Amino acid sequence: MKVAVLGAGAWGTALAGHLAVRHDTLLWAREPALVADLSASHENARYLAGVALPASLRYEADLAAALDHALADNALCVVATPVAGLRGLFRAMRDAGKVPAHVVWLCKGFEADSQLMPHQVVAAELPEHKSNGVLSGPSFAREVGQGLPVALTIASASAACRERTVAAFHHGAMRIYTGDDVVGVEVGGAVKNVLAIATGIADGLGLGLNARAALITRGLAEMSRLGVTLGGRAETFTGLTGLGDLILTATGDLSRNRTVGVQLAAGRTLDDILGALGHVAEGVRCAQAVLAIARAHAIEMPITQAVCAVLFDGVAPRDAVSALLRRDSKAE
């Protein structure tokens, strides 16, 4: 099978390496200098240092050439850009007249200005395209790059998209589950990043494991309330792309969003933290969108509100925690 992976960040690189073990895989990067480095070393020293990539993996800086690779019969296009780059990439496909038959995206979050979910952005740019979906689940790029076990879910209304995705990814140490709750999967992927900032703050303040467990559990309730209201199914949020991804992101030391929270608790500014990370922390990007959507639907999300207060309103992390603890008792 031919597979084109569009986006050579940590996640795109790790998945391209996995795919290249079995398939004719091409990894597209926006920067020619990065493509040159990848081709010479078979290592993404910028985003996934120390992880060796298969010699069979090929690299391309020309988007048109990468799309041509994905236009082959039964090929798969994997879009590995952040949410902020999703619309532009799909618009480029449309404008070039090079829209692959089967497309999956990996990004987690809401588009900042429109507050749209990724599938809504795709539908706006490619309204006639049907064989598409989101691949998500509890996964750190570095562990996938190292060949460690992982389980992901492909959510799509298209059986053809689900079948192509399983055929591409389900081998080695990677297990793929299938479903059709695109809304639930996308809401889970967005909200868990915001909640991971909250658990990072609690861990950074030394509030203990009890507090972490409470935040994860009550955070899951926030995620479920929002997701069901937006059209997701309740059972999705106790699966891999809901609770599973939340546990990993909220507790794992490789989590960028959790790291943001830990560093905020240590007194560092958000600008300094993001500058030092050198990677996208989607929880910061989409926190305000999540809260705005919740308020528009009169959904109570106090943990998300507390995270936004720390990120954008200058509220001290310890004060935000105190405000949560002062909330009135209620039925669970």
Swiss-Prot record:
- What EC number(s) is this enzyme filed under? 1.1.1.94
SUPFAM superfamilies attached to this UniProt entry: 6-phosphogluconate dehydrogenase C-terminal domain-like, NAD(P)-binding Rossmann-fold domains
Question: Which Gene3D superfamilies would you find in this protein's record?
Answer: N-(1-d-carboxylethyl)-l-norvaline Dehydrogenase, domain 2, NAD(P)-binding Rossmann-like Domain
Cellular component terms (Gene Ontology): cytosol
Enumerate the residues binding NADPH.
W11, R30, K108, A141, R256, V280, E282
What GO terms are given for molecular function? Answer: glycerol-3-phosphate dehydrogenase [NAD(P)+] activity; NAD binding
- GO annotation (BP), single: glycerophospholipid metabolic process
Check the record and name the PROSITE patterns matching this protein: NAD_G3PDH (PS00957)
Record's keyword annotation contains Cytoplasm: yes
User: Which residues are listed for sn-glycerol 3-phosphate binding in this entry?
Assistant: K108, G137, S139, K192, D245, S255, R256, N257
According to its UniProt record, where is this protein located? Cytoplasm
Which pathway does the UniProt entry assign to this protein?
Membrane lipid metabolism; glycerophospholipid metabolism
| Highest taxon above the source species | Bacteria
Which HAMAP family would you find in this protein's record? NAD_Glyc3P_dehydrog
PANTHER family the record matches: GLYCEROL-3-PHOSPHATE DEHYDROGENASE, GLYCEROL-3-PHOSPHATE DEHYDROGENASE [NAD(+)] 2, CHLOROPLASTIC
| Primary role | Catalyzes the reduction of the glycolytic intermediate dihydroxyacetone phosphate (DHAP) to sn-glycerol 3-phosphate (G3P), the key precursor for phospholipid synthesis.
Name of this chain's protein: Glycerol-3-phosphate dehydrogenase [NAD(P)+]
- Taxonomic lineage per UniProt? Bacteria, Pseudomonadati, Pseudomonadota, Betaproteobacteria, Burkholderiales
What gene, per UniProt, encodes this protein? gpsA
